[in-house]
């Protein structure tokens, strides 16, 4: 059978419709689905007995699971994978939901990027009713956008570094020699001429020694300023922070009525290293279902992530973690819309 341009050799049209109906029903109800339910609720034009036989075949093919011989069936990881890859139609958001996302992103435009993506994670948790996770940008592949030294008194300046990703770093520098306003202005100009648009990873001690040699007249101040600038620049340079929102949203899902399962989930998301490894991605939208997650603790979860970018350069990841029974179509639609708006904001250089 040809679906979305892809031939599914082992499936006929009737099996596809029955599988779609079962997945749709199970996502909505969280109850194993029987043949009588499908026959009553979905106009498939076949009897309950025929549906039962087809469901048995789908189970043999690995698309469905049956917990008990007397119970209905539910989708397997393989069934969900076929659904999201070939059968799912992306749900269109309401105009109110689209407006809420756009307004939320626009209102966060005055913040630095780390705050913006955390705000995006909060609206994602609110709309999806799932636990959301965001990985903040690393500075290592970024460049310095501006350097500002602000005089606090004759022997003290505040260093403010702005990275092109929107990250802002600051530090207070104590000077051994007093500095006038004119000297402060000149040193600000020197630092911005020499370091502006330079990649962070290119700035090392040798580079700063060259700057010191080139501007000997200002050495008595630069020898205090440059080491602190270097230290400030390197602090957390290659660390992607992980932020979570909506951890208690899992209790909206009956899967987590099981106390042990809920504890396991909360333990998983509390392990930032595990979460970081789980959500790393280079793709626009990535969906990992159940056993596709290589970490054992996440093998009954689905993780849907998207990469947000600065002028087409990947910065970090944002996504959701929840049970394999989740409203995939709606979540993908919300996440896609959110990341599109986030990318527009960053591309417009508003941060």
Swiss-Prot record:
GO terms for molecular function: DNA binding. Gene3D superfamilies: 3.30.450.40, Heat-inducible transcription repressor hrca homolog, domain 3, Winged helix-like DNA-binding domain superfamily/Winged helix DNA-binding domain. One of its GO terms (biological process) is negative regulation of DNA-templated transcription. Keywords: Repressor, Stress response, Transcription, Transcription regulation. Belongs to the HrcA family. Negative regulator of class I heat shock genes (grpE-dnaK-dnaJ and groELS operons). Prevents heat-shock induction of these operons. HAMAP family: HrcA. This is Heat-inducible transcription repressor HrcA. The gene is hrcA.
């Amino acid at each position: 059978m040809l679906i979305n341009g892809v031939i599914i050799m082992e499936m006929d049209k009737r099996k596809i419709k029955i599988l779609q109906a079962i997945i749709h029903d199970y996502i909505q109800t969280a109850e194993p689905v029987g043949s009588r339910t499908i026959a009553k609720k979905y106009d498939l034009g076949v009897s309950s007995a025929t549906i039962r036989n087809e469901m048995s075949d789908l189970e043999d093919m690995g698309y469905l699971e049956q917990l008990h011989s007397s119970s209905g069936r539910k989708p397997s990881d393989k069934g969900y994978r076929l659904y999201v890859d070939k059968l799912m139609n992306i749900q269109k958001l309401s105009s109110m939901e689209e407006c809420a996302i756009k307004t939320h992103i626009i209102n966060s435009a005055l913040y630095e990027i780390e705050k913006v993506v955390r705000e995006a994670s909060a609206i994602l948790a609110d709309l999806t009713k799932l636990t959301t996770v965001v990985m903040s940008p690393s500075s290592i592949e970024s460049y310095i956008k501006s350097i500002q030294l602000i005089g606090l008194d004759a022997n003290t300046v505040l260093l403010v570094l702005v990275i092109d990703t929107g990250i802002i770093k600051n530090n207070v520098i104590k000077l051994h020699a007093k500095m006038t306003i004119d000297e402060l202005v000149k040193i600000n100009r020197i630092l911005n001429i020499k370091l502006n648009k330079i990649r962070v990873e290119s700035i090392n001690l040798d580079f700063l020694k060259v700057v010191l040699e080139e501007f000997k007249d200002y050495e008595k101040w630069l020898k205090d300023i440059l080491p602190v600038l270097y230290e400030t620049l390197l602090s957390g340079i290659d660390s992607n922070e992980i932020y979570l929102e909506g951890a208690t949203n899992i209790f909206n899902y009956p899967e987590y009525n099981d106390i042990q399962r809920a504890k396991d989930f909360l333990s998983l998301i509390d392990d930032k290293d595990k979460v970081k490894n789980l959500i790393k991605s280079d793709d626009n939208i990535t969906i990992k279902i159940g056993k596709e997650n290589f970490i054992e603790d996440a093998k009954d979860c689905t993780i849907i992530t998207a990469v947000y970018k600065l002028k087409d350069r990947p910065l970090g990841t944002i996504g959701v973690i929840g049970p394999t029974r989740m409203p995939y179509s709606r979540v993908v639609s919300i996440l896609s819309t959110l990341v599109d708006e986030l990318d527009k904001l960053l591309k417009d250089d508003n941060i």
